[in-house]
Amino acid sequence: MQIKILGCESFGARSLACIVKTGERKILIDPGVALARLRYGLLPHPVEVAAALRVREKILAELEGTTDIVISHYHGDHMPMKAEDPYQLPVEALPDLKGVRFWCKGPGNISGLSARRRKEFFRYLGHSLPASEGISSEGVSFSPAVPHGTRDKGFGTVMMTRVSEEDEVFVHGSDIQLLDREAVMQILAWKPSVVFVSGPPLYLSHHVPEASNEALENALLLAENAGTLILDHHLLRFLEGYRWLKDLAGMVKNTVVCAAEFMGKKPELLDAQRKSLYEEMPVPRGWHEAYEKGEAGVEDYLL
């Protein structure tokens, strides 16, 4: 089994995209990328835009030879979009996907916006999308719908993915944020070797200490029972999240890392550092409007 993470907050942009290769199959999970429209009252810094472009290019390059595409839910950082925003992966950039098998979160318990995006995507593809929750097929399994964060808070649901080859098991936990024990127990029941999952959103005002404690307990459960736990996404939109990750790593013998570290790279928490990026590298007035029109690029902002 080969696992390659294509994008995540530790790569500088919002994503949870990865490739898993087993035998003749190449499975692309959550092929999307996005940037926060506003953080600290600021639009994305061009350094972040450059990072999002790198993730987009990696996703498009990896589509060659892909046999399966999984979409865990219909947020813009997890799927190609119908040109809603210049920092995402537009469906118009996709190659011909004829012959690729899709595995998707069904239409149940999703927002009206997510339902619209699902419809737009299958209209673009020219065929309907399956509802894959609870399905198993040839080494690939999908969970029933599980909460996007805390249960019964109105944040919708996501679908987790299990990929196995011989004695190796990879689990993509999507955006569960370690805030629902049932979802975590589902992962443990799958007996994972490697888990790639979103950590808790410490940066959000509605995230309370009790939720952080619950997330830590769930993270410890995963870290003690999986050989490698890759925690990223919501967790690393805040610098304190990286310290939370390192504290967790110090509590267990197994490997606990962010996505960049798993791929042998240095973490770049650009989302969390937007304010300091503007202070260190001021952005000319009108740059974002010019970028959207194709009149400005990121060449001067490559790290």
Curated annotation (Swiss-Prot):
InterPro entries: RibonucZ/Hydroxyglut_hydro, UPF0173_UPF0282_UlaG_hydrolase, UPF0282_hydrls
S-S pairs: none
Top-rank lineage group of the source organism: Archaea
SUPFAM superfamilies noted in UniProt: Metallo-hydrolase/oxidoreductase
PANTHER family linked to this entry: UPF0173 METAL-DEPENDENT HYDROLASE MJ1163-RELATED, UPF0282 PROTEIN MJ1629
Entry's family note: Belongs to the UPF0282 family.
Name recorded for this polypeptide: UPF0282 protein MM_2966
